[in-house]
Amino acid sequence: MDGFIGDTTALLARTPELLRTLLIGLPQAWTDTPDTADGWRPRDVVGHLITGEQTDWMVRTRRILEHGTSVAFDRFERFAMLERDAGVPLDELVERFARLRNANLAALRELITDADLERRGLHPSLGEVSLRELLATWAVHDLDHIGQIYAGLAGSHDAEVGPWREYLGILLRREDPAAVAG
């Protein structure tokens, strides 16, 4: 198997345990703050990751393998979690995500080979994309949202850090993405 597939799935396999370690059992006061003023709380991010597991990554992988570029991917409902997951405890969302991710990675390992990586699909707004690009995006998408979760957790104590705020880039970037800690 291409090192790319093994390396990418190894990273993807770590996300459920990272989320368990980071979020399960934390008080709601830590998890109710969005990463930016109009951003997502950690629970929203986990819900968004669940949506990806249900309707995006493996669905698009199968679409590439079965149809190539002849059938475009469905659009991704980025905000589906807001209504679907209202009132669901965060710990339950983390466990739901873990089950879905583990099942998807098991299916992925059975489904693709190195030879499939350059096969192409059709994204509704980006045009043609390769399976390799889709899988790389899946992994980087995790990293992007893990950073978002950390920013939300840090934001829950924004006021409490007092004058040290000017040294904490994770807090400064909540208001100005280009900010660098002092």
Residue ranges and their predicted role:
Residues 1-30, 52-63:
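Alpha-helical bundle segments that constitute or directly flank the non-heme di-iron/ferroxidase center
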Residues 4-14, 37, 96, 126, ...:
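Short, contiguous, pocket-lining structural segments
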Residues 8-12, 16-24, 80-90, 102, ...:
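Small-residue-biased structural context
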Residues 15, 78-119, 129, 133-141, ...:
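Acidic/histidine-rich alpha-helical segments that form the ligand environment
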Residues 24-31, 109-118, 155-158:
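Surface-exposed helix-capping loop/turn segments at secondary-structure junctions
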Residues 32-76, 105, 121-182:
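Short, contiguous alpha-helical
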